Amino acid sequence: MPSAVKLAGPAIHPGKVLADELAVLNVSPSQLARAIDVPVNRVTQILHGRRAITADTALRLGRWFGSGPEIWIDLQTDYELRIAEAELGKTLLAIPVRG
């Protein structure tokens, strides 16, 4: 049975994680875009937190990094849950736990 758990820490957009990884590898956004066959603006929008990582992008990133898509989808899901939790605030706390 699911339990209510407050997510810890700030919401970190997966674009920040991607930017950090690219910096370590010394890979530019345009190099990544070419490598995963997407428009460069998709990559730059993700890097700037203006675009979500979709299943399509997660599959491409997972293939290129050799890590699988799950890490990228999980980062996006975690980010969205933290944002939603912060937005719902007291409304969420007012919902009774069944049981």
Residue positions per predicted region:
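The DNA-recognition helices of helix-turn-helix-type DNA-binding domains
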Residues: L25, P39, R50, F65, ...
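Glycine-rich, small/polar surface segments that engage phosphate groups of diverse ligands
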Residues: P69
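A short, Lys/Arg-rich alpha-helix, primarily the initiator
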Residues: P2-V27, D74
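Short, basic-rich loop-to-helix N-cap that marks the start of a DNA-contacting helix
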Residues: R50-R63
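A general alpha-helix detector
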Residues: V17, R42, T57-R60
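Short, charged recognition helix plus adjacent turn
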Residues: R63, I73-G99
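Short alpha-helical DNA-recognition segment
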Residues: V27-Q45
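The alpha-helix within a helix-turn-helix
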Residues: L22, A33, G62
